[in-house]
Amino acid sequence: MKQGKKFISPGAWFSMVYPADWNEFEDGEGSFLFYNPNEWTGNFRISAYKGSATYGKEAVEQELKENTSATSVKIGPVSCAYSKEMFEEEGVYYTSHLWVTGMGDVAFECSFTVRKGEPVTEAENIIASLEVRRANQKYPAEIIPVRLSEIYQINEAYEWVSNTVKEYLKKDFQGQEEDIANMQQVMDSGNIGAKKKEAWLALGITLCAILANEVEGFEWRTLIDGNREAPVLVNVADGAMIDPMKLVWSKVKAGE
């Protein structure tokens, strides 16, 4: 079996495994989009909704009742209401395969849009891997491929540090090793209060971004640890992790 990548949703409602050669891409709010950027085999979208203890099962029953073209199917251990619709775009015909499924208090809407006649195995494998994470259960910490939500956090942190260096030191910020001394000046200036966690965390994230730019073999990942969901840097060769929070903020908090 081909190795896959694990995705744990923001808020850790659910997890799933998607193909190793796929990536996550920007989509509408509350919807997650995945596809292969090198060889397009279809767009997979998933949205999750939380409700009562039996909401997942009820969502499937409701879809079967209200959508006359929906049929009951089982994908691995997962019961779904399945339907499909065709459409044409610029002379090409596509099929949107739609699955409504759910487990416990979470309902899912999944779609896989492919060229007409193309297989849906990749989408079915993702759906079969779906797991709902229970709110009252403690899960071991996990490092997964970096999600878009953490990429946005990294970009925002970098932009804030860049603007702050320009504001206080009147110097351009290139995201290179030479900029670390400028960041140190900002840290030592007393302009950032000891309780400003987000600012100190942004400095830690930007330090890691410089390291990732300057040193080969470091890649961003997402850490899921209890309620904490954060970007971390991982050395691909040995799996060693650098946590931006511990670089700066943890030390400031401890009064170091």
Predicted regions and their residues:
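Short, hydrophobic/aromatic-rich segments at coil-to-beta transitions
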Residues: M1-K6, S31-F32, G76-E85
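Surface-exposed amphipathic alpha-helical segments
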Residues: W22, F108-A141
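Short beta-strand
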Residues: F25, S72-K74, R221-I224
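Amphipathic, interaction-prone secondary-structure segments
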Residues: G30, S189-A237
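Signature of long, low-cysteine stretches enriched in small and polar/charged residues
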Residues: A59-A107, S111-K116
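N-terminal low-complexity, intrinsically disordered segments
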Residues: P140-E198
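A recognition module on extended beta-rich or small alphabeta surfaces enriched in W/G with H and D/E
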Residues: V232-E256
